[in-house]
Amino acid sequence: MPHRWQVVVLAVLSAVALACEGAGNAGPAPTGKPKPKPGRPSSMVALGDSITAGFGSCTIFVACSRNSWATGSADAVDSHYRRIREANPAIKGHARNLAVPGAQAADLPGQAASAVDSGAEYVTVLIGANDACSGGVDEMTPVRTFRGHLDKAFGRLRKGLPRSRVLVVSIPDVHRLWQLGHDDPGAVRAWRRGICPAMLANPTSTAAADQDRRRRVADRIDAYNDQLARACDAYGDRCRWDGGAAHGIRFSLDLVNRTDYFHPNVAGQNRLADATYPVRFTW
């Protein structure tokens, strides 16, 4: 029969062994730093035109990327960047805005090349308004040409950033803007200065020719959006189409600035961010 002291020693050694085993299986001690939610990127870049550049959203009428729906860092806009940063602080300081006021689809391949150089993990694309708006109806970019520019740009992204996520955003509904503002004195005055003439010239006219012109521009924007969706589908599973969310925004004149009654103000940029932000980064 073992002595009492032997029993005590064995019990103590067993307890120590169990404690050591438990410590070996324990996870690392908390560091105090929040863990990023799965899939949230640590860098991003925005491609496009004046809408994404935040043009007209500041007190002076210039590009204002800090208010951009995509990469904006200002408190006034709950941009994609700020939402991602809340979930993944590693993205802080790693958001570039390459959008240029006046850019058309023809400029997208060059922007895509710069995006590749940045090595961004998340890319947003909103392009096409200027292809419809930059001149008269006959000057609109042909649909086939538009698609060719998309394919070239997306090809560069797919080759240069094969693991990055791409979000393609639909062109907002410019015809709805005309519907909202054609009887607003401030909008009419602004549009007569040459804002998107293909759609907004002679804004108060009900002549058949003007109505037909507006219909043709609306149809062309629909065709561009169709090609954006198709190009994204052809890109593969690393591209997501917004499903027409931006085009479907039921906006009001309160969402555009009071200088040109065309570009989104801070509230409009927020609305774009709300409509297009991916709930999950699972693609």
Residue ranges and their predicted role:
Residues 1-13, 220:
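N-terminal export and membrane-targeting signals
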Residues 77-81, 107-115:
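Alpha-helical scaffolding within the catalytic cores
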Residues 24-95:
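Serine-esterase "nucleophile elbow" of acetyl-processing enzymes
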Residues 93-105:
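Functional beta-strand-loop-alpha-helix junction segments that form "active/interaction loops"
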Residues 110-266, 274-281:
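Alpha-helical cap/lid subdomain in secreted, periplasmic
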Residues 41-45, 51-64, 73-74, 105-107, ...:
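Extracytoplasmic/periplasmic mature domains of Sec-exported, cell-envelope-associated bacterial proteins
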Residues 16-19:
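C-terminal motif of bacterial Sec signal peptides marking the signal peptidase cleavage site
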